[in-house]
A protein has these predicted regions:
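A glycine-rich (often HGG/GG-containing) alpha/beta subdomain
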Residues: 1-146
Length: 148
């Protein structure tokens, strides 16, 4: 199971940051980071649920945020996937990433790994994956249009 910050954050932070998790242990990760209190997440896939995020080792509150769960195969990667929408301060982001990295069988994703998994699971074709890369890297209106 992998995780990564999906939002491009400036050094000063931002209002909101999104952290994605994908893989077989995604529901376990949700349970750990919410202390088993992600009420309704299984019954309401693709719907935002407000949760407290805690460090499972200390029970310390990290943040309150929105959790979205996308069960396989109907997710970007084709695997169970969730998004944690948190406040975008560097302190909150770094704490969440640190805590996720300490959860068993959960590791930081390599660059492009979510899209690679989508490609390998038949959710995207190579040309679509290249288009996503080009769109992410687009700096001009012309580059944006060509990527689409």
């Amino acid at each position: 199971t992998i995780f990564a910050l999906s939002t491009n954050i400036k050094s000063s932070g931002s209002a909101i940051a999104v952290i994605r998790v994908s893989g077989d242990k995604t529901l376990n990760v949700i349970d750990e980071i919410t202390n088993g209190k992600a009420d309704g997440i299984r019954e309401k896939p693709r719907q935002a649920c407000l949760n407290d995020y805690v460090d499972p080792k200390t029970n310390e509150l990290i943040d309150k945020g929105m959790t979205l769960w996308f069960p396989r195969p109907k997710s970007y990667t084709g695997e169970d996937l969730c998004e944690f929408h948190i406040h975008g301060s560097m302190a909150v982001i770094n704490k969440m990433l640190s805590v996720l990295g300490n959860i068993n069988d959960c590791r930081l994703a390599r660059e492009g790994e979510f899209t690679r998994r989508a490609l390998m699971n038949g959710k995207l074709h190579l040309i679509q994956a290249e288009g996503i890369r080009d769109l992410i890297n687009a700096r001009t209106e012309n580059q944006r249009r060509r990527a689409l």
